[in-house]
Amino acid sequence: MGKSCKVVVCGQAAVGKTAILEQLLYGNHVVGSEMIETQEDIYVGSIETDRGVREQVRFYDTRGLRDGLELPKHCFSCTDGYVLVYSTDSKESFRRVELLKKEIDKCKDKKEVTIVVLGNKCDLQEQRRVDHDAAQHWAKGEKVKLWEVSVADRRTLIEPFIYLASKMTQPQSKSAFPLSRKNKGSGSVDG
């Protein structure tokens, strides 16, 4: 297991951020149970990557954003990844995700961060307000992966989080300290 990764989970209020985390990590969320508004919580999970390595991930479950509320500035520091959540039955929640993506791009200081977008409540087809193809088109343009998920079906949650953990912990292909052939093995700094 490598370093612990910090992932900020954010989106509009009542889109299912906490329910997604509790169902993913513990499998104990009951659909339709009373919602308690989150202030800010931290969940720690161990996720097996596509390389078969278990990685520890700290999920920062943020308060649901409402009009006028922005993501707190501390959510942008030392963050390895983001999970942006909207509800497929709310166009407003999708617009909030679009704004969050712009805010992240502005604040990430050229650091590579992994962003996944989850459209929750995909099982409520008759209440759908966000077009699946339009959302995928937006995600492709933003170079982020988007999955439609349902807390009612835990299996839909697994693939996005394996992708997230795998992408954040990808081994470096090159050394952080490349040595030219000329200097290899000399060990001497003075000339």
Curated annotation (Swiss-Prot):
Entry GO terms, CC: cytoplasm
Region (Disordered): 170-191
Keyword GTP-binding listed: yes
Region feature Small GTPase-like, mapped onto this chain: 1-191
Keyword terms: Cytoplasm, GTP-binding, Nucleotide-binding
Example GO BP: negative regulation of canonical NF-kappaB signal transduction
NCBIfam families associated with the record: small_GTP
Domain statement: In contrast to other members of the Ras family, the members of the KappaB-Ras subfamily do not contain the conserved Gly and Gln residues in positions 13 and 65, which are replaced by Ala and Leu residues, respectively, and are therefore similar to the constitutively active forms of oncogenic forms of Ras. This suggests that members of this family are clearly different from other small GTPases proteins.
Annotated family: Belongs to the small GTPase superfamily. Ras family. KappaB-Ras subfamily.
Biological role: Atypical Ras-like protein that acts as a potent regulator of NF-kappa-B activity by preventing the degradation of NF-kappa-B inhibitor beta (NFKBIB) by most signals, explaining why NFKBIB is more resistant to degradation.
Protein name as it appears in the record: NF-kappa-B inhibitor-interacting Ras-like protein 2
Gene: NKIRAS2
